[in-house]
Amino acid sequence: MLEHTLEEYSTLGKENILLYPVGKKVEEAVRKLGYTPQGSYQDMADKPSYTEAYQLAEQLMALYAGKTVDRVVLIYHHFKSMGSQVLTKENYLPLDLEQMAMQVAMHPDKKEMASYNNDYIVEPSVGELIAELLPKVLCQKVFTVLQDSNASEHAARMLAMQAATCLLYTSPS
């Protein structure tokens, strides 16, 4: 998926594509494709910490806010279940408000939620509240992606070890 995504942006030129690989293998893949990683985040993949995730998220948000980049895309393994880890590509910035609205519209408790939405007085204002909370939500998203990817890696390793153990027990001697 990394290669496919890089092909989508190939018209921009390699020097205009900034990659922040998390993990040793991803960093090696980025280098092999001829790109220069924008930092080393190898340890973050093994033991994700909120502090490191916060720093990475702040850096990505600053690049976007400063118009250094026009979008940020996250590619990671989403842990669906022990037997299923899905490689996921997700737009991080700019926020896709239409997609968020669709998710809310599809929520099974939408009617029940709507009755509560009109009962709140927000101070100082909705805009200020969103401006305060949005960076925190974006930082939490990076941390969640790191945790998700870490869980996927552990699940894949466990399945591989179980399969190898089964092969040991079933091989003819």
Model-derived segments and spans:
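C-terminal beta-strand-loop-alpha-helix "lid" module of Rossmann-like NAD(P)-dependent dehydrogenases
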Residues: 1-171
